[in-house]
Amino acid sequence: MKTFAPLLATLLLAGFGSALQWWEHGNFYQVYPRSFKDSDGNGIGDLDGVTEKLQYLKDVGMDGIWLSPIFASPMADFGYDISDFYNIQGEYGDLAAFERLSAKCKELGLRLILDFVPNHTSNQHEYFKKSVQKEDPYTNYYVWHPGVTNEDGTKSPPSNWISVFRGSAWEWNEDRQEYYLHQFLKEQPDLNYRDPALVEEMKNVLKFWLNKGVSGFRIDAVPYLFESVEVENRYVDEPLSRATDDAENPAYLIHNQTMDQPETYDMIYQWRAVLDEFTAKDNQTRIMMTEGYTSIPNVMKFFGEGEQNGAQIPFNFQMISNLRKTSTAADFARYANLWLDNLPAGRRSNWVLGNHDNNRIGSRLGEAKIDLYNIALQTLPDIAVTYYGEEIGMVDQPIPFNETVDPAGLRAGPDDYTLYSRDPARTPMQWNSDKNAGFSSADKTWLPVATNYKQLNVKAQDAAQKSHLKLFKRLTTYRKRQILTHGDLDLRTTDSNLVLYKRKVDKVGYVVVVLNFSDEPQSLAAIKQQFPGADDRLQVVASSKLVTIKDNKWINVADTELPGESAIVLQKLWGPNPVVVYEA
């Protein structure tokens, strides 16, 4: 059993509308621009395409959109190798296209969040080119080392560190006659945050885009920002993990010298201070989201420490990292509770079930459970983050090696690429049953469109009597009401593989959500067994595809079964359950 009282849960009807800032119960949508909508027919999504579809995002209930990287890039890692932080990638448009997008967001009341990639740049960036030549102030913008001289006079890297993308994390540069560090591709040299000039320049990047009206940033690859310092003219080797015999695989080492260094958190706090400067000017809160696949204690440090504030939304990857198709109700509860048990007082929860680096929900957790997980995402406390296409139940599209473009897959080779390639979860958005699913008029798109697009698309689901999309819209509308914005949480499991949780606000009412992780029907009598004070009759708010009971109908819970791998949202109101209006 888990009980959890979110911040401000006791605020009731009088004045509760002023209790929440816009992000505190926000619904955020990750747009992968390359795959969202192509406006000019070249097979690649772009900013004008995103602008064209903003009304759709408003209609599905979003409060903010997070754009994966849109800055100038040679595209060695599809935008995560930035060659100019102050300009837009030409394939996506230009600054004028960005201004159009920003203006339309403001018109629709959508907040715009940009992906900030601070750990590294492209090796084509002017910073790097000038650092190679030792032109100040760029000389120490990157992590350089002359290497270790061997007895025969040859050079070796200054440590055994391994890149995320396999092989040594050190690359020799002939012009500078030194090694540079790259924790990702060799085309992505690591920036040196021990250099004060670099720290100030990256703050200038944030300020540039804040001055253009963005509402915040998602910070990429945060645990990698700092490495340990040199000891006796070399870096400390990382210990062997014993997890694999493959010495090229990053899992070969325990990354205690290249991740989660103490200085990382102070850098996050410094960036938050930049955002707060802008918030103070106009009382419009700017937010920070952080990406960190690291331990729970480390993630929680991103929130802040003492008087220092950090990210409002350190991404909660517990379910992405740990749940699979075979996961049970107990597994779901374990990872929900692990997050909630460690959440610092006064901080907001967030729930992330998909992104561009992981298999889609249907492929990772089971197609039959797509609705179940979307119901959970939209009814758990506080913030929800949705990856594009998950609202219609898009699934991974198998892609042959000769059409693979993801460097992680290509570097693994034709035998193992399917274990590493992220391309299957990045295919074009499926808008309708027209050519290329309505994504593009091009003869060839940058990645193949999923073969199921004729049946699975936005237009078809909008027209269907019951669909993933219609359920998603109903959920995002309902979650703006007071029970889900302010209700406490009481989460339980049963031996029959059910998760049940209750969200309640005194004098307003309560919601009960039931998730059936079994593949067999289960009686909703479990509601009364787990919550003895619950009513015999409850009203259906929403349900997954296999549930035949119509929304708004009243049911006797003791007489009702929930189909396998399905979910249902029920309510009992004692008074008005109004929509909560957010502050700036």
UniProtKB/Swiss-Prot annotation:
PTM per Swiss-Prot/TrEMBL: Glycosylated.
A GO BP entry: carbohydrate metabolic process
Signal peptide annotation: 1-19
Entry keyword set: Glycoprotein, Glycosidase, Hydrolase, Secreted, Signal
Pfam families xrefs: Alpha-amylase
Role according to the record: Functions as a glucosidase that shows high activity toward sucrose, a major component of nectar, as well as maltotriose. Assists the mosquito in its sugar-feeding capabilities.
Name used for this protein in its record: Salivary alpha-glucosidase
Organism (species): Culex quinquefasciatus (Southern house mosquito)
